[in-house]
């Protein structure tokens, strides 16, 4: 497949349909939906064809795939296009490194970096690898790479410093952030709004609210990076966390004034933060502003708004918005359904919750593990453990949306095992264990100890219990070992 740089116009409608694909590549890949399976299928079809595509369009598509977390398709597109003659800039190589690390794990990313020509080992590729280390919380490797960059006289960008400071906030090492700020200044590296935001968050983590306010003052004095809406959303969130409601409201007012471009994410922050302040009237006011600014309201917007209304105990308002969304949605998002199901369950309105659960599949909604978890929690609290186990079994069988295993919380498992022990219900305890085994191979003492106590309380025996413990490689405590003499006759 030949590749070309776009020299003048990027108007894809002016392509010759004999040579080039008839529609934007990104649109073609998402023709059948945004799931990774569908995107991979469309990508494979495109790569089997003979149509040409512009280099800028490949880059734009890779960027959009990355933004949606579709790293494997983005990597495959990048690799195949290179095989077919697309020359990679150092910037392209930095992006490719990031994709390799995310699609094939960090070691593959390291190997890609090592194999790059020395001319490609610039701040861009070093910075990309550093960011990968930070994402994986590999502090020692990240710090080592930063030191190596300094030894090679490669000045890190603000993005590299931002990545490392974000790493410190995630690992609870916020005390290292001020030193990074001082180093950044000493290197004459231009900070950006993210730099200031992560600095503010680090100070807030140590309850240094006056320090946070000094950062804003410094931004205003410096003048190179003006506080934007993200700065004030960050500030408002910090004030809310600190219980400083009046200051939080003032920051939110600043946020509104800074949102001149009517940014969707800014509206989301406003709704969430006014909700955390308990300002229901303001929540509705911002919702109306969002609807005026962006008439085609997305599922994500409805999800956030309904969640906020539920937290503010405005169930009638949440129901009204749900009906509005349901009447106009193109995709029946089960996450939104789950919010209302959860609200009904919380209020004890289990019939309404069940009605929603039954209607969802008819509208194209796919019940997920969260749906069944909500019902499981309700039945556990209601003492209906048989139904709780049924719901748990369904949640485990569905698993997580990303393909991972779903398991109930340790608190739920303890509550169930405690109940079965009190009721001397051996069958219930064994059923729970079997359900858990469908989701994990790691059944430990926290399950077997109450199981053995349940057998003992019920006056029942399990001749092979010691063998089970040995097979599962489980070591129980001394008190449980004594009960084994009653429960198990095997040696």
Curated annotation (Swiss-Prot):
InterPro entries, A to Z: Pentatricopeptide_rpt, TPR-like_helical_dom_sf
Protein location: Mitochondrion
UniProt-listed Pfam families: PPR (PF01535), PPR_2 (PF13041)
The protein's name in its UniProt record: Large ribosomal subunit protein mL101 (rPPR4)
GO molecular function: mRNA binding
Chief place where the protein resides: mitochondrion
PROSITE patterns with a match to the protein in the record: PPR
The keyword Ribonucleoprotein is assigned to this record: yes
Family: Belongs to the PPR family. P subfamily.
Self-association and partners: Component of the mitochondrial ribosome large subunit.
Keyword set, alphabetical order: Mitochondrion, Repeat, Ribonucleoprotein, Ribosomal protein
UniProt keyword S-adenosyl-L-methionine present: no
GO cellular component entries: mitochondrion; ribonucleoprotein complex; ribosome
Ranges for the PPR repeats: 122-156, 157-191, 192-226, 228-262, 263-293, 298-328, 333-367, 368-402
Source organism (scientific name): Arabidopsis thaliana
């Amino acid at each position: 497949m030949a590749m070309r740089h776009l020299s003048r116009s990027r108007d894809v409608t002016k392509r010759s349909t004999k040579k080039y694909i008839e529609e934007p590549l990104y649109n073609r890949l998402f023709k059948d939906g945004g799931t990774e399976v569908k995107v991979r299928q469309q990508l494979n079809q495109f790569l089997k064809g003979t149509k040409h595509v512009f280099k800028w369009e490949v880059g734009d598509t890779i960027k959009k795939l990355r933004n949606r977390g579709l790293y494997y398709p983005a990597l495959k597109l990048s690799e195949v296009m290179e095989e077919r003659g697309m020359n990679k800039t150092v910037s392209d190589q930095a992006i490719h490194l990031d994709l390799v690390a995310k699609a094939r794990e960090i070691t593959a990313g390291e190997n890609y970096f090592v194999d790059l020509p020395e001319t490609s080992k610039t701040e861009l590729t070093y910075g990309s690898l550093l960011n990968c280390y930070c994402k994986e919380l590999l502090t020692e490797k990240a710090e080592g790479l930063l030191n190596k960059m300094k030894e090679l006289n490669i000045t890190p960008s603000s993005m590299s410093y931002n990545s490392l400071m974000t790493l410190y906030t995630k690992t609870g090492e916020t005390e290292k952030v001020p030193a990074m700020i001082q180093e950044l200044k000493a290197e004459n590296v231009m900070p950006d709004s993210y730099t200031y935001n992560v600095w503010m968050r680090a100070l807030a983590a140590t309850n240094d609210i006056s320090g946070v306010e000094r950062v804003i003052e410094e931004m205003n004095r410096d003048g190179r990076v003006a506080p934007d809406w993200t700065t004030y959303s960050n500030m408002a969130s910090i004030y809310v966390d600190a219980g400083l409601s009046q200051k939080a409201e003032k920051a939110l007012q600043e946020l509104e004034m800074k949102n001149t471009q009517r940014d969707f994410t800014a509206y989301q922050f406003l709704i969430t933060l006014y909700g955390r302040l308990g300002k229901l009237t303001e929540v509705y006011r911002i919702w109306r502003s969002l609807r005026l600014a962006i008439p085609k309201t997305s599922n994500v917007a409805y999800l956030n708004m309904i969640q906020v209304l539920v937290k503010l105990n405005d169930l009638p308002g949440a129901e009204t918005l749900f009906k509005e969304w349901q009447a106009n949605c193109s995709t029946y998002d089960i996450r939104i359904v789950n919010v209302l199901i959860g609200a009904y369950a919380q209020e004890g309105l289990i019939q309404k919750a069940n009605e929603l659960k039954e209607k969802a599949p008819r509208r194209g909604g796919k019940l997920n593990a969260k749906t069944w978890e909500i019902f499981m929690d309700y039945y556990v609290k209601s003492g209906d453990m048989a139904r709780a186990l049924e719901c748990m079994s369904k949640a485990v069988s569905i698993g997580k949306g990303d393909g991972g295993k779903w398991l109930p919380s340790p608190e739920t498992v303890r509550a169930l095992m405690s109940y079965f022990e009190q009721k001397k219900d051996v069958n219930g305890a064994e059923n729970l264990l079997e359900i858990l085994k469908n989701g994990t191979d790691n059944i430990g003492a926290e399950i077997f100890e109450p199981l053995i106590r349940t057998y003992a309380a019920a006056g029942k025996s399990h001749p092979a219990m010691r063998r089970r413990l040995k097979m599962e490689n489980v070591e129980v405590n001394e008190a449980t070992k004594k009960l084994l003499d009653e429960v198990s006759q095997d040696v």
